[in-house]
């Protein structure tokens, strides 16, 4: 929304990241997995909005080709608490194909040290003035691009520890709920 409103209401808009309460998250930098565990959560009523209807068949194709190197944890319509538990063993989470930025689910995954495949466009980093951290494996809404990015992480799973550590650092740096609350208060006081 920021990108849409900023040109017209520049004095009334500010980009403030989504908050994550890091006290409620157990972070763990992932090691190089023997078998890469992909996690995809599917809400049947929203699959086409989140892009999981496009990502899942591509992920299944990668799993078929590299069954000795990866597995898939596929979760359908579970309560949020159960979703979080099932995500704990993941190395890589797929979410929000059409987004420019990570979703709340992706941020939660990143806070846990899970690498995210999804919305991580250059604009996401530019709006934060982030020039070094690049924890998100950005994918385009294109089956070939998704396949190439998934295949690449399967064949180069040695990247997982670095991406995992960057994910934790990214969320702590930009999405800590206390820092986000301060940004809201600062903006409110100025206006």
Task: Label every PLM stretch briefly.
Residues 1-13, 57:
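A short, active-site helix/loop in glycosyltransferases that binds the activated sugar's phosphate group
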Residues 16, 20, 24-50, 56:
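Conserved donor-binding/catalytic core segment of Leloir-type glycosyltransferases
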Residues 38, 56-84:
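A conserved nucleotide-sugar
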Residues 84, 106-111, 125-126:
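Short alpha-helical segment that forms part of, or immediately flanks, the ligand-binding pocket
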Residues 88-101, 114:
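Acidic donor-binding loop of glycosyltransferase active sites
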Residues 115-122:
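Short hydrophobic beta-strand element within catalytic cores of glycosyltransferases
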Residues 158-189:
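A charged, aromatic-enriched C-terminal amphipathic alpha-helix characteristic of glycosyltransferases
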């Amino acid at each position: 929304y920021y990108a849409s409103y900023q040109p017209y209401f520049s004095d009334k808009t500010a980009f403030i990241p989504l908050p994550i309460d890091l006290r409620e998250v157990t972070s763990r930098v992932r090691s190089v997995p023997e078998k890469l565990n992909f996690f995809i959560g599917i809400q049947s009523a929203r699959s086409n909005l989140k892009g999981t209807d496009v990502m899942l068949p591509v992920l299944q194709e990668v799993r078929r080709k590299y069954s000795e190197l990866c597995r898939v944890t596929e979760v359908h319509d579970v309560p949020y608490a159960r979703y979080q538990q099932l995500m704990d063993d993941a190395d890589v989470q797929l979410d929000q194909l059409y987004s420019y930025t990570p979703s709340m689910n992706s941020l939660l995954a990143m806070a846990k040290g899970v690498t995210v495949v999804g919305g991580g466009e250059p604009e996401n980093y530019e709006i934060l003035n982030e020039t070094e951290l690049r924890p998100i494996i950005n994918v385009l809404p294109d089956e070939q691009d998704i396949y190439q990015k998934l295949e690449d992480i399967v064949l180069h799973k040695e990247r997982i520890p670095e991406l995992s550590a960057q994910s934790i650092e990214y969320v702590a740096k930009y999405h800590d709920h206390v820092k986000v609350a301060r940004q809201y208060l600062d903006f409110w006081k100025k206006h």
